[in-house]
Structures are given as structure tokens and as C-alpha cells.
Regions:
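Cationic, low-complexity basic patches in intrinsically disordered or flexible, solvent-exposed regions
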Residues: 3, 17-18, 23, 261
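ATP-binding N-terminal substructure of ATP-dependent carboxylate-amine bond-forming enzymes
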Residues: 28-130
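Short acidic-hydrophobic, aromatic-tinged amphipathic segments that line or gate anion-handling sites
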Residues: 78-84, 156-160, 191
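A conserved helix-loop-beta module that forms one wall/lid of the active-site cleft
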Residues: 125-187
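Internal nucleotide-binding/catalytic subdomain
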Residues: 187, 191-329
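Active-site "cap" helix and flanking loop/linker of ATP-utilizing ligase/carboxylase catalytic domains
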Residues: 280-303, 320-391
Length: 392
């Protein structure tokens, strides 16, 4: 397939905001043209993305870097390129004449994979590195939320562990202690006692349990309520809500144990019915898009607000800049329509609300994890007789 392409000049509306280099061709697709896709990642989310993308009649080939047994089972071609190897990913996309790149995890996005692909003239469904800091830095996200007037927990940011500990003693428990940077969903401690909060500061900032992610720390007020995940597809100026979802992060039954990247999810979340989606987007998504656009970086891709539904209304706990895992799995099971076309519409700045629809059925995803997760756990184990389990 040879897609049509045009060279855009600076100063042409939306594309000027995207800061496309003068010489980079912008590729767009007409209805009926087939595309070659590269999905980045190796988890259940990427398996779900491949499953959904391959339902499009426009897809000729799907590559996954590095992929897993599930993506191979869907007929995708797994390629041994790590999700964090930006040079390798760009080289792969060029070699295989990829028409659409779909990053799954946060690491390539915060590392600038969209910027790199854009420089190579390859459409990429995801935000640039500046916008991806919404997820990559909790302090940055708090700053944007405050500028945009988005409701969120009161917080303080620290780079000195002694000052952070003094604040813990002064504020008292319960508190939420967060590593500023990426920690695979495991850098948040809900401290029920002052000692737990002090230990969390020590682990994150002094012992560097999460490496460089703990160089800066965010201490937040403890919010009471029920959590929900609210995702919108965005084209830089338009945000279209997806159905709500709810994931459960505690490692053990009964919401007990340490936080994980997610042990399961379902959609919809009863706490956030779809008839409230537009109002929620107006409150927590569209103001962020406007703030980032004012910064000169329109947000393209999935913007995910992790919400706490409190007695005083919804408050944002965090933003992710990609599909959640495991929320992606039940969400994509409910999503109707051509996801390939929807992603291209987002990249091209012409997303239409009517292009998204979903089934009214409920979807559920459950995570099977190795013993010991999210702490040290064995890896490389073979999964037998359980990769596809039916629920009655």
C-alpha cells in the first residue's frame, strides 16, 4: 500500500500547533486503503489492542515489539525490539513501512516515541513527550491541573526527604505518598499511620525503591470515595469519552495488600454512568487539553483520568497518557467500530463524536500474576491450560 501524502507548510492551523518540521510529509489515508501497524508493548493491553485492531478490514499486517504469546496467537508478527528502544522502534517502523504506530505502555511515550516517529514522517497514536509528562511526572500533572482548574487532592512537592518527613509529621495521617516519576503503578503508598508515611518517604527518596522516580516526592491529602477510570480519545482539540471502567489495584482479595498495576477491571463502572460522561469530560479532560494547547502542545491520543468519586464530587488522582492495563481489555471488548480509523482521525485532527459507539454489555478482565507480585517474583514461567478461560 502506498498512502497518499502531502507536505504541509508552517502556519497552517492545527498542524502548526503540532509543530511538524517543514520537510516532514504528513501521511493521511483515504477510506479503503490498507495499513501496516506497529503496536509497542508486551502485556495484556497490547494483546487486546492487536485483537481489536485486526478486526479492521483495512489492516494488512500487525507487528508487535516485542509482543507476547497472546499477540502471536492473534496472528501478529512479534519482533524482538524492546518497548524502550526508541532507535530500534523507529528503524523497525521504517524497515517494515509502517503506516500507524500504536504505543501501549507509558515508557516509550514519556521517552518521546511520538516525537521520533513524527520526525520520521510516521503517524503515531499518542502524545508528544511534553504532554506525556502528565503521566511521567506527578508534580507536572499537579501544576497543569491547578492551572486548568481541575479538581484534585491538595498536595505538596518535595525534593528534600527531611522536609518531606517534617511535612508528614505536621500534617498527620492518613496521607498518600507518591514517587514523582514512573514506577509501573507501584510508586503510590496510602499511609494509614504517620509511621507508614515516614517509611514511605524513606523508601522512595532515601532507599530509592523506584530509582530516579523517587528524586522528587508528592504528598497528598487522603481522599475517601470510590475510584473510577475515565478515558477520552483526543485529537488535540476534541475529546470523545469512552465508557467508564474500574480497576482494582490491591494485590489481595478484599482490597488488601500493596498496590499493583491492576489485578482486574470491569466496564462500565456503576459509579460513573455514561450519561455523565460529557459533564465529566468538561470537568477533567477538556480543560487539560486547553491548557496543553496553550503551552503549544496539543494532546493527541488517550487521556485517562484516574478519579476518586468523593462526597464533594469527583477529584483527579492522576492522569495516564495511554490506555490503562487492565482497563484496556474490557473497554476494547465493548468498543464498536473501526479502531484503526478512529486512531487515524485523532492523529489527523478530525475526530468526530459519532465515530465512537459501544455495546451496552458489561465486560470483565482478570489478571493472573506470579506469586510475590508486585514485589520480587519469578519470571519466564510457561502458562499452560489457562490463557483463554471462559466464565459462566
Amino acid at each position: 500500500m502506498q498512502p497518499r501524502s502531502v507536505s504541509l507548510r508552517r502556519g497552517t492551523g492545527f498542524f502548526q500547533q503540532l509543530r511538524l518540521p517543514e520537510s516532514v510529509p504528513y501521511v493521511y489515508f483515504q477510506g479503503g486503503e490498507v495499513v501496516r501497524i506497529l503496536v509497542i508493548g508486551s502485556g495484556g493491553r497490547e494483546h487486546a489492542l492487536v485483537w481489536k485492531l485486526k478486526q479492521s478490514p483495512r489492516v494488512s499486517e500487525v507487528f508487535v515489539a516485542p509482543g507476547n504469546g497472546g499477540t502471536a496467537r492473534e496472528g501478529a508478527i512479534n519482533v524482538a525490539v524492546d518497548a524502550g528502544d526508541l532507535d530500534g522502534l523507529v528503524e523497525l517502523a521504517r524497515k517494515e513501512k509502517i503506516d500507524l504506530v500504536v504505543p501501549g505502555p507509558e515508557l516509550p511515550l514519556t521517552g518521546g516515541i511520538t516525537d521520533r516517529m513524527r520526525e520520521a514522517g510516521i503517524p503515531c497514536f499518542g502524545p508528544d513527550a511534553y504532554c506525556a509528562r502528565l503521566e511521567g511526572s506527578k508534580a507536572f500533572a499537579k501544576d497543569v491541573m491547578n492551572r486548568a482548574g481541575v479538581p484534585t487532592a491538595r498536595s505538596q512537592v518535595f525534593t528534600d526527604p527531611d522536609k518531606a518527613k517534617n511535612a508528614v509529621v505536621k500534617l498527620g495521617a492518613p496521607l498518600v505518598v507518591k514517587a514523582d516519576g514512573l514506577a509501573a503503578g507501584k510508586g503510590v503508598v496510602v499511609a494509614r499511620t504517620t509511621q507508614e508515611a515516614l517509611d514511605a518517604v524513606d523508601d522512595i527518596m532515601c532507599k530509592r525503591a523506584h530509582g530516579a522516580a523517587g528524586a522528587k516526592l508528592v504528598i497528598e491529602e487522603f481522599l475517601v470515595g470510590e475510584e473510577a477510570s475515565f478515558l477520552c480519545l483526543c485529537d488535540g482539540k476534541t475529546a470523545v469519552p469512552l465508557p467508564s471502567a474500574q480497576d482494582h489495584k490491591a494485590a489481595y482479595d478484599g482490597d488488601q495488600g500493596p498496590n499493583t498495576g491492576g489485578m482486574g477491571a470491569y466496564s462500565p463502572a456503576p459509579i460513573l454512568p455514561y450519561d455523565q460522561a460529557e459533564a465529566m469530560a468538561d470537568m477533567v479532560i477538556r480543560p487539560i487539553l486547553a491548557a496543553l494547547a496553550r503551552d503549544g502542545h496539543p494532546f493527541v491520543g488517550v487521556l485517562y483520568a484516574g478519579l476518586m468519586m468523593t462526597g464533594n464530587g469527583p477529584k483527579v488522582l492522576e492522569y495516564n497518557t495511554r490506555f490503562g492495563d487492565p482497563e484496556c481489555q474490557p473497554l476494547l471488548m465493548r468498543l464498536e467500530g473501526d479502531l484503526v480509523q478512529i486512531m487515524l482521525d485523532c492523529i489527523e485532527g478530525r475526530l468526530r463524536p459519532e465515530s465512537l459507539s459501544h455495546t451496552s454489555q458489561t465486560a470483565l478482565g482478570v489478571v493472573v500474576a506470579a506469586e510475590g507480585y508486585p514485589h520480587a517474583y519469578p519470571k519466564g514461567m510457561v502458562i499452560e491450560n489457562g490463557a483463554y478461560v471462559g466464565l459462566d
